[in-house]
Structure formats: structure tokens, C-alpha cells
């Protein structure tokens, strides 16, 4: 009996080692997370799309609606998430640029990110739901929130003044069907 318990424990440890990206979402004993696709648009109805390798927000109509980027999400903890696009192959990250924080897309596979890695913290966002809207604060840059400009077709970025009326930090965030 003791040998079978040891073998079972060893087998579980081995499988966790092999499939760390699938199990990084939750501690032992919980079902592993999977990447899920979400639609995102700001409270002014601007959707995200890619233009010249930059994520922008604008009003897409007619045949252009197919340009809308779905946001790939891997939950890390109840309110912490990794965000990506293109099947999780490009991930949103917060990096310091001078005195400002900058949002950038990095060619990293979202399922390779690990929740306890200090180097992966720049990819982590804190999801806060308030009624029908959601905001995303950078875990690496506290106080900096994912935002869109008031004008259409401008880059998606970060702001440290989420209450100011010059940037939009509230989004509708809906799982894609």
C-alpha cells in the first residue's frame, strides 16, 4: 500500500513537471486553467484591433468587424490574469520607459508564463469587476491601468490617472462564444 501511494505521488509530481504551464494557474488539488477568449470593448464602444503590430481601439463597422482582436486570458489567481492576442502568442506587458509605464505586445506564449515568476509579473494584470464593467491594473506597475484614448484609432495604453476624463479605463469584457 505504501509503495502504491509513493508511486502515485511520484507520477503526479512528474506530470506536474511536464505540464507546468497548464497547472501554473492553480495550486495542487484544483482543476488546471485553460486559455479562454474574450471580447473586449471600452465604455465608448471602441473595440481592439491590430494595426502595424500595435494594439489600437476604434469603431469597426461592416467588413472591418473581422479585424476585432479577441483577448486571450489565462487566470492566475482569482483576480490576476495574463492577457494576450493571436491565440496567446502575443502577450500584453507593462514596461518602464523613462518616467512612464508603457503597454507593449511581446512575442511570448501565454501558456508558458508562470504566476510565481518575477520576470513574468510584467504580464500580470489585476482584473477588477464593477457592475457590468471591468478594469485591468498592472501587477508590475501598481496604479497603472489598461486604457484607451477618447479618440478612435489610437493605441491601447496605460494610465496612472484612471479617474481623469482623458482616458477610458472601464471595459466590457465578455467570454467569446
Curated annotation (Swiss-Prot):
Residues spanning the membrane: none
Pfam name, any one: IL1
Glycan attachment positions: 109
One Gene Ontology term, aspect cellular component: extracellular space
SUPFAM superfamilies: Cytokine
Alphabetical UniProt keywords: Disulfide bond, Glycoprotein, Secreted, Signal
Major location category of this protein: secreted
Protein's UniProt keywords contain Cell inner membrane: no
Protein name: Interleukin-1 receptor antagonist protein
Amino acid at each position: 500500500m505504501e509503495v502504491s501511494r509513493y508511486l502515485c505521488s511520484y507520477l503526479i509530481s512528474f506530470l506536474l513537471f511536464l505540464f507546468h504551464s497548464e497547472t501554473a494557474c492553480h495550486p495542487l488539488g484544483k482543476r488546471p486553467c485553460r486559455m479562454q477568449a474574450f471580447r473586449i470593448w471600452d465604455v465608448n464602444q471602441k473595440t481592439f484591433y491590430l494595426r502595424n503590430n500595435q494594439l489600437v481601439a476604434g469603431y469597426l463597422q461592416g467588413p472591418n468587424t473581422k479585424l476585432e482582436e479577441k483577448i486571450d486570458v489565462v487566470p492566475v489567481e482569482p483576480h490576476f490574469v495574463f492577457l494576450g492576442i493571436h491565440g496567446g502568442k502575443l502577450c500584453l506587458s507593462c514596461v518602464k520607459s523613462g518616467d512612464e509605464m508603457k503597454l507593449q505586445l511581446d512575442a511570448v506564449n501565454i501558456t508558458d508564463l508562470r504566476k510565481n515568476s518575477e520576470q513574468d509579473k510584467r504580464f500580470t494584470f489585476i482584473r477588477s469587476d464593477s457592475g457590468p464593467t471591468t478594469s485591468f491594473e498592472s501587477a508590475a506597475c501598481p496604479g497603472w491601468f489598461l486604457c484607451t484614448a477618447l479618440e478612435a484609432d489610437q493605441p491601447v495604453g496605460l494610465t496612472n490617472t484612471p479617474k481623469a476624463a482623458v482616458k477610458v479605463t472601464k471595459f466590457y469584457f465578455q467570454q467569446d462564444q
